[in-house]
């Protein structure tokens, strides 16, 4: 195992987010990453920021750091060796077994810990680590930056010239002339000119990643929350301090705007209320000077002021409030994992870690490829981009769907087709402060519905479908989208944000039909567990499959796992393991396991297995010592829908695990259902899944 030590060159360079972003980038290369913050950053008793987010967002198991007070006590008493021994013990605990690389984050530099630079160098040396320097372009000239990197590198460079893994530059302006910058840096720094300190990445400023939630602003200003609304999810992208008349300010009442006003500005309050009711998701309305609007105004605007619009009150006047807003702390609070997750993805996307990853891999060790969650998501998006498929979204004016389609179009994940009146889609986008990208296709169902009547009658002629019946059914946008898929005009369909599962699946069964060799349609969820991605099937479609159907589900799920790069070890689940139980339910699982082995002898499959015997190595060794699957299953096949759906939701909620899916299996062409509570990210990943499935379907047909 190799160790990387991340060290800052000065204060405020984004050390913690870079450390965790690097961890994510290396995980995408299927390296098993461990994380360590050896010494706590502050004297506060709360969990260190980087440790908290390593656990909560990066899903890395890491021990608590040595308290800063204890470290300083040891250093002041000449106990540096004792301190280093404790650090090494922590490193071994953090690395555990089988890790490819340990990322250790040093101490950030500040005016209190003047010793941090020297201590960081000693930590790196004692951990036998290669060092990644983290620096910033903020507030320095290229010449100053070159000198800073050269001096810092000398503190971590070993006598044989090794010890430097590279450097990362944060807070780069978007208009940076990269070529000129690197030329000047290399002209002044020997370690840069020689290549001893390679550049790992330049991370530009992204204002969206600095956006605090309305709740964060309320906490920082000690504001009274009059109406919480969606304060936990809305983000402040701009602040509007009302000093002018309303007609001169309405153009500022945009998505993410925080309206700061005295409570006696009834015109501003009513304008904010109207803006909210028209669909603009303002970040909030803040009354200054500890005041409240007149009762008549509150009554007039009651619908807006008691709904999802956050309403706050602060004791300071507007000028003082505006001044405090300018000086807010933009660090990510512990209860905002979504923002940190986006930040880590943003950083990982901008790090070139392929050469570094090659160095970190132990030569000559051929182990099974792991697929941690971040690598799964990354590869999902990359493969979808490569597929370049056209995906129809029948719920074309649903806000989450519109936002997901915009994101997919901008990132090149898929060529999305929204089925909805174009004007309505534009209104939905504007209400969310979004612009429709040029490549996003919008089709008005009213203008195309008629051309699908005859083809639909032909497809359903064996069922006696008439033209009037077809016309009536095509009023449903899901049916219309399914016909587009049946005729090959699109490559896949995603629906379910507002429609039921039956509304999505039924037209597919009638018009798309099952794939050759498939006797049924089933589903899987990709469970993004902290260590790896697991497959759960079927947790969405088949209520009580018989043995033959259960075997089909297992084979379909195994093939899906393989298609997405997940090692296939299938556990046929039951309430008993091996021969310990009996009864109709157990016999069904035994028979299904037998059928899978007969039909696909190359698959690693075993059952019946209890969930703990399938997933926990120690339990698997105890209950099924001869099983090739017990304790290390990756594909979990549930005996019925009740068990599968309950388990998936329990794991998802109790363990905070992201579940991607359900992904439908067994159809001739890909159709996927969404949960009606799906988030925008869920829809994006489902679109990506569908695009990849479309590639596989085309290959199977070809």
Curated annotation (Swiss-Prot):
Listed GO molecular functions? phosphate acetyltransferase activity
Q: Where in the cell is it found?
A: Cytoplasm
Where is this chain primarily localised? cytoplasm
- Keyword Ubl conjugation present in the record's keywords: the answer is no
Which InterPro entries does the UniProt entry name for this protein?
DRTGG (IPR010766), P-Actrans_bac (IPR016475), P-loop_NTPase (IPR027417), P_AcTrfase (IPR004614), P_AcTrfase_dom1 (IPR042113), P_AcTrfase_dom2 (IPR042112), Phos_Acetyltrans/Butyryltrans (IPR050500), PTA_PTB (IPR002505)
State the Gene Ontology BP annotations. acetyl-CoA biosynthetic process
SUPFAM superfamilies membership: HprK N-terminal domain-like (SSF75138), Isocitrate/Isopropylmalate dehydrogenase-like (SSF53659), P-loop containing nucleoside triphosphate hydrolases (SSF52540)
User: Which cellular component terms (GO) are annotated to the entry?
Assistant: cytoplasm
Region: Phosphate acetyltransferase, residue numbers: 375-702
Keywords attached to this entry: Acyltransferase, Cytoplasm, Transferase
Pathway the protein contributes to: Metabolic intermediate biosynthesis; acetyl-CoA biosynthesis; acetyl-CoA from acetate: step 2/2
The record lists the catalysed reaction(s) as: acetyl-CoA + phosphate = acetyl phosphate + CoA
EC number in record:
2.3.1.8
PANTHER family from the entry? PHOSPHATE ACETYLTRANSFERASE
What job does this protein perform? Involved in acetate metabolism.
Q: Which family does it belong to?
A: In the N-terminal section; belongs to the CobB/CobQ family.
The record's comment about this protein's domains reads: The N-terminal region seems to be important for proper quaternary structure. The C-terminal region contains the substrate-binding site.
The subunit field of the Swiss-Prot or TrEMBL record says: Homohexamer.
The name this protein goes by in its record: Phosphate acetyltransferase
């Amino acid at each position: 195992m190799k160790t990387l030590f991340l060290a800052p060159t000065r204060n405020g360079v984004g050390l913690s987010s870079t450390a965790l972003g690097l961890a994510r980038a290396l995980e995408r290369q299927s390296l098993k990453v461990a994380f360590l913050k050896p010494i706590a950053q502050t004297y506060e008793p709360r969990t260190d920021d980087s440790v908290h987010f390593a656990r909560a967002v990066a899903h890395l198991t890491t021990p608590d750091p040595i308290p800063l007070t204890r470290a300083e006590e040891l250093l002041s008493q000449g106990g540096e060796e004792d301190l280093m021994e404790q650090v090494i013990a922590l490193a071994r605990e953090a690395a555990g077994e089988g890790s490819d690389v340990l990322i250790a984050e040093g101490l950030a530099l500040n005016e209190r810990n003047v010793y941090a630079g020297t201590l960081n160098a000693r930590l790196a040396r004692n951990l036998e680590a290669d060092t990644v320097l983290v620096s910033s372009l903020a507030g320095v000239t290229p010449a100053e930056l070159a000198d800073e990197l050269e001096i810092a590198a000398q503190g971590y460079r070993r006598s044989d010239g090794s010890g430097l893994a590279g450097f990362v530059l944060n807070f780069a302006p978007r208009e940076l002339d990269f070529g000129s910058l690197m030329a000047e840096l290399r002209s002044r720094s020997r370690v840069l000119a020689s290549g001893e300190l390679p550049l790992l990445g330049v991370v530009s400023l992204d204002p969206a990643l600095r956006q605090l939630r309305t709740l964060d602003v309320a906490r920082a200003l000690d504001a009274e929350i009059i109406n919480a609304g969606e304060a936990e999810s809305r983000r402040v992208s701009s602040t509007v301090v009302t000093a002018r008349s309303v007609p001169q300010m309405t153009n500022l009442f945009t998505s993410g705007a925080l309206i700061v006003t005295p409570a006696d500005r009834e015109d501003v309050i009513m304008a904010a209320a109207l803006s909210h009711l028209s669909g603009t998701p303002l970040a909030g309305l803040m009354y200054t000077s500890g005041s409240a609007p007149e009762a008549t105004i509150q009554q007039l605007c009651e619908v807006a002021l008691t709904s999802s619009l956050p309403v706050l009150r602060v004791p300071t006047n507007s000028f003082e409030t505006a001044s405090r807003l300018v000086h807010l702390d933009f660090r990510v609070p512990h209860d905002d994992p979504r923002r940190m997750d986006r930040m880590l993805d943003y950083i990982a996307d901008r790090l070139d870690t392929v050469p570094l990853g090659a160095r970190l891999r132990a030569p000559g060790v051929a182990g099974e490829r792991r697929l941690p969650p971040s690598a799964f998501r990354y590869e999902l998006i990359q493969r979808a981009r490569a597929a370049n498929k056209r995906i129809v979204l029948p719920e074309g004016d649903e806000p989450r769907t519109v936002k997901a389609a915009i994101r997919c179009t901008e990132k090149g994940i898929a060529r999305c087709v929204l089925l909805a009146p174009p004007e309505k889609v534009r209104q939905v986008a504007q209400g969310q402060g979004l612009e429709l990208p040029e490549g996003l296709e919008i089709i008005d169902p009213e203008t195309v519905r008629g051309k699908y009547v005859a083809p639909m009658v032909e497809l359903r002629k064996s069922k006696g479908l008439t033209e009037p019946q077809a016309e009536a059914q095509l009023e449903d946008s899901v049916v219309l989208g399914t016909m587009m898929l049946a005729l090959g005009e699109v490559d896949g369909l995603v629906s379910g944000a507002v429609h039921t599962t039956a509304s999505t699946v039924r037209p597919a069964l009638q018009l798309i039909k099952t794939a050759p060799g498939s006797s049924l349609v089933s589903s899987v969820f990709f469970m993004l567990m902290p260590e790896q991605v697991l497959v759960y099937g079927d947790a969405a479609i088949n209520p009580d499959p018989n043995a033959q159907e259960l075997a089909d589900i297992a084979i379909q799920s195994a093939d899906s796992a393989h298609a997405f790069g997940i090692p296939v070890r299938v556990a046929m689940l039951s309430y008993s393991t091996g021969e310990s139980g009996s009864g109709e339910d157990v016999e069904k699982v035994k028979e299904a396991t037998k059928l899978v082995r007969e039909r696909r002898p190359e698959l690693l499959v075993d059952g019946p297995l209890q969930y703990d015997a399938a997933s926990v190595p120690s339990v698997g060794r105890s209950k099924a010592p001869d099983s090739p699957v017990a304790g290390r299953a990756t594909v979990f096949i549930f005996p019925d829908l009740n068990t599968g759906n309950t388990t998936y939701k329990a794991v998802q909620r109790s363990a905070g695990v992201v579940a991607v899916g359900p992904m439908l299996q067994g159809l001739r062409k890909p159709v996927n259902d969404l949960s009606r509570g799906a988030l925008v990210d869920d829809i994006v990943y489902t679109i990506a899944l569908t695009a990849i499935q479309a590639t596989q379907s085309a290959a199977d047909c070809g």
